[in-house]
């Protein structure tokens, strides 16, 4: 496969070659021995939903019993609020505590629209309702909101008011407008929108069936305002596009060059129908595009698109591609023109399940848009590089007075420029990740990545980009990518967090840097998740350093949130290597085995016993040592058919007297080894145990006799002290007690006997009735 070209097709032989490459990769992954390198891909810390609740670092939103499907979030750091779009509802929540004094707007779909939706064969619960898909800040006082309206999208304005302390939060239901080309009809269709300069840019389907997809601009205060969209007549502009994200990004210091970049995936058909595939794209348009004068009227005249590549280079030239873009995140930098672009991709194969994160630079994206165009003679031909004359001004360039005083708007573009852009919207070259390969990948796991947000964190030993990755099973991975020697990258999965009680796909995530919180939405709920939980790593300096979490450092007393400061304080942290020896060498308790838990266990000869040892870190490897009774030396325990090493500890079958001693469970991470558990095992001889049991049995009989005697003595006193209490009454009482005891002792058997007795009685009465009827006749 020619990796330097975007639109070159894959032939059948190339597809077959790629299939063999996939199979070789699968076999390699399946039969790869478990090494320390593979252990690094395991999450170091795995916390369940219950663990997160107990740590008070995960707060579920409890205020919605009727409105679910939380896939639209709008975070307002300035006001300290989170707007949540759900089914038939819009919620106003506090960023500090989701459940504190929240407000809601009930906005259902019209009843007649719900009935029409049902008649069209749509699901009454999952589709025929008003699912909120657009929440965009319109100005300082209003938010623009759109809902699917039971496949009849509507939009309106929510008034928040100017007072930040007392928000109004009211929907203006008297000025609702059509949501077509602004909001999808289908609540489950991928969709992207952004509001800038009071213009709404949306990528969505424009019809009920969802076949016609378009990227549009609407609203605005321009006097000659018209909605602008992609050209529906040209199939190679957009082909079944699924929009993922859209962002305003300035290209230069000149505002006339400002552009809207949008990311999507679409179908690509090359030549014949057998060459259909899914491609991920980045597209762009100029913000000041108003359409053409004689051609492309009310259509984009600056629309261009290029392919995004996310693949693992193969040794034999066949790359492993992750073609389906799932989410995009722009990490801001000091230069607003050059944010870092993070993308989550998945494989299209149903056989091979994999996900990857690829990182792109805006410089590389712009270079592709400034490069050669792709050309296609007809629908049956393939894309090739265009080598002909390129008209002036270069197609895709924004009109600017500084660029050309004669071209003040896109309506001033010459006809040959409009004609060229109409037939050549595709760039020939593709955009590749900055490292030439994925920054992070998950292969051969039971989930796929769905969402991403990234936080740039300053640590003691450098700066790191921490990725929070949502999955389709309701977990969040906290990942840091660390640069090593020779530009090699190390993927470190710090945490795997089960943020929902039951598996559910994560649909949206918003990051609050001010609150240091992550807000995670799914079909089933919304949770507020802390970015860090340093105290869960341990109570020693070594535990804190081994965590390699850029958010956390040892402050001398505990593992706590690291804050960069000019003051010289003893903050111990080693994200790059995770080596406690270099950081905690002067803290004896942190590197000594004296901090290990100590337990005493008794085992019986010839029986089995289990010595539990579960390291907090899943990346640690465990070794066992024994110091036998009367011996000063320790020896390493080697597993055999009698001694079995498991992930949870050591199973010793058929205990022997020589197994007595002190057992040390040592965990190793990187080069650091420390004892986490010390177990003293005492083996009781079998003969001694039998004698003890015999003595206990005899002693138990005496105790029962004494206890029974005490009961009898109480009863005798009761008879003597109560002249009205006869001996017959006492005997009858004792008989009932014994009967009750026997019944409780064998209650299942007793119930069975009672049922049998009832059946016999019923059968007897039935037979008697039949006999009486026969005699009567």
Swiss-Prot record:
Q: Name one GO cellular component term.
A: extracellular space
Phylogenetic classification of the source organism: Eukaryota, Metazoa, Chordata, Craniata, Vertebrata
KW Transmembrane helix (keyword) present: no
The protein's job, in short, is: Induces the collapse and paralysis of neuronal growth cones. Could potentially act as repulsive cues toward specific neuronal populations. Binds to neuropilin.
Species source reads Mus musculus
Compartment annotation: Secreted
**What family is reported?**
Belongs to the semaphorin family.
InterPro entries hit by this protein = Ig-like_dom (IPR007110), Ig-like_dom_sf (IPR036179), Ig-like_fold (IPR013783), IL-1RAcP-like_ig (IPR041416), PSI (IPR016201), Sema3D_Sema (IPR042582), Semap_dom (IPR001627), Semap_dom_sf (IPR036352)
* Gene Ontology MF, one: semaphorin receptor binding
Annotated region (Disordered), positions in chain? 740-777
Q: Which residues are glycosylated?
A: 139, 607, 724
Biased segments, Basic and acidic residues type? 766-777
In terms of one coarse class, where is the protein primarily found?
A: secreted
Q: Which Pfam families does the annotation name?
A: Ig_6, Sema
Keywords assigned by UniProt, alphabetized:
Developmental protein, Differentiation, Disulfide bond, Glycoprotein, Immunoglobulin domain, Neurogenesis, Secreted, Signal
Q: Which GO terms describe its biological process?
A: cell differentiation; nervous system development
- Domain observations: Strong binding to neuropilin is mediated by the carboxy third of the protein.
Q: Where is the Ig-like C2-type domain?
A: 592-680
The molecule here is called Semaphorin-3D
Q: Which SMART domains match?
A: PSI, Sema
């Amino acid at each position: 496969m020619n990796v330097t070209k975007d639109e070159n097709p894959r032939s059948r032989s190339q597809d077959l070659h790629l299939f063999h490459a996939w199979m070789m990769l699968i076999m390699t992954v399946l039969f790869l021995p478990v090494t320390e390198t593979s252990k690094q891909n395991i999450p170091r810390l795995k916390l369940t939903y219950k663990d997160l609740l107990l740590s008070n670092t995960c707060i579920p939103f409890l205020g919605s019993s009727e409105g679910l499907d939380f896939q639209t979030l709008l975070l307002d750091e300035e006001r300290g609020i989170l707007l949540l779009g759900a089914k038939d509802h819009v919620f106003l929540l506090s960023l500090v505590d989701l459940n504190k004094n929240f407000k809601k707007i009930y906005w259902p779909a019209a009843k007649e629209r719900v009935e029409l939706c049902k008649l069209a064969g749509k699901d009454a619960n999952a589709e025929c309702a008003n699912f909120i898909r657009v929440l965009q800040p319109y100005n300082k006082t209003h938010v623009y909101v759109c809902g699917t309206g039971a496949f009849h999208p509507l939009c309106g304005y929510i008034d928040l008011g100017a007072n930040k302390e007392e928000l109004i939060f009211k929907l203006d239901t008297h000025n609702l407008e059509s949501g077509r080309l602004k909001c999808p009809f289908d609540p489950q269709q991928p969709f992207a929108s952004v509001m800038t300069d009071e213009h709404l840019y949306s990528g969505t389907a424009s019809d009920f069936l969802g076949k016609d997809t378009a990227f549009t601009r609407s609203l605005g205060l321009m006097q000659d305002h018209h909605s602008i969209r992609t050209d529906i007549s040209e199939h190679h502009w957009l082909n079944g596009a699924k929009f993922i994200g859209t962002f305003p990004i300035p290209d230069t210091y000149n505002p006339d060059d400002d552009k809207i970049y949008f990311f999507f995936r679409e179908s690509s058909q090359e030549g014949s129908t057998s060459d259909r595939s899914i491609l991920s794209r980045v597209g762009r348009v100029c913000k000041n595009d108003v359409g053409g004068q004689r051609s492309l009227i009310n259509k984009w005249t600056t629309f261009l698109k290029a392919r995004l590549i996310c693949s693992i280079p193969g040794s034999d030239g066949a790359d492993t591609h992750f073609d389906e873009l799932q989410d995009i995140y722009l990490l801001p930098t000091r230069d607003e023109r050059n944010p870092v672009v993070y993308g989550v991709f998945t494989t299209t194969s149903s056989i091979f399940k994999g996900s990857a994160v690829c990182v792109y630079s805006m410089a590389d994206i712009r270079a592709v848009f400034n490069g050669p165009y792709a050309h296609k003679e007809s629908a049956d031909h393939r894309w090739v590089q265009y080598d002909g004359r390129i008209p002036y001004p270069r197609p895709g360039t924004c009109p600017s007075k500084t660029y050309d005083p004669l071209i003040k708007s896109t309506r001033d573009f010459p006809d040959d420029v409009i004609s060229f852009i109409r037939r050549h919207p595709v760039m020939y070259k593709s955009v590749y990740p900055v490292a030439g390969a994925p920054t992070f990948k998950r292969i051969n796991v039971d989930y796929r990545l769905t969402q991403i947000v990234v936080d740039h964190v300053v640590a003691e030993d450098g700066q790191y980009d921490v990725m929070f990755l949502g999955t389709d099973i309701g977990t969040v991975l906290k990942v840091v990518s660390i640069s090593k020697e020779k530009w090699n990258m190390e993927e470190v999965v710090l945490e795997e967090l089960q943020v929902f009680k039951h598996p559910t796909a994560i649909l949206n995530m918003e990051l609050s840097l001010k609150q240091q919180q992550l807000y995670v939405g799914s079909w089933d709920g919304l949770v507020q998740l802390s970015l860090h939980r340093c105290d869960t790593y341990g109570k020693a300096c070594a535990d804190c350093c081994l965590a390699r979490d850029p958010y956390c450092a040892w402050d001398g007393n505990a593992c706590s949130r690291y804050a960069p400061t000019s003051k010289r304080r003893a903050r111990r942290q080693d994200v790059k290597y995770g080596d406690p020896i270099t950081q905690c060498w002067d803290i004896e308790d942190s590197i000594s085995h004296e901090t290990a838990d100590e337990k005493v266990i008794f085992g019986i000869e010839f029986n089995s016993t289990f010595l539990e040892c579960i390291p907090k870190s899943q990346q640690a490897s465990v070794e066992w040592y024994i110091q036998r009774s009367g011996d000063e030396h320790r020896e390493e325990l080697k597993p055999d058919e009698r001694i079995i090493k498991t992930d949870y500890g050591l199973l010793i079958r058929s205990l022997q007297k020589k197994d007595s001693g002190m057992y040390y469970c040592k965990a190793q991470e990187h080069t650091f080894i420390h004892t986490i558990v010390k177990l003293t095992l005492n083996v009781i001889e079998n003969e001694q145990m039998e004698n003890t049991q015999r003595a206990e049995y005899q002693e138990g009989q005496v105790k029962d006799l004494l206890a029974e005697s005490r009961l009898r003595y109480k009863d005798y006193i009761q008879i003597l002290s109560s002249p009205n209490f006869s001996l017959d009454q006492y005997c009858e009482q004792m008989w009932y007690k014994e009967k009750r005891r026997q019944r409780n002792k064998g209650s299942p058997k007793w119930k069975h006997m009672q049922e049998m007795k009832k059946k016999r009685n019923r059968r007897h009465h039935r037979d008697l009735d039949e006999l009486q009827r026969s005699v009567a006749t």
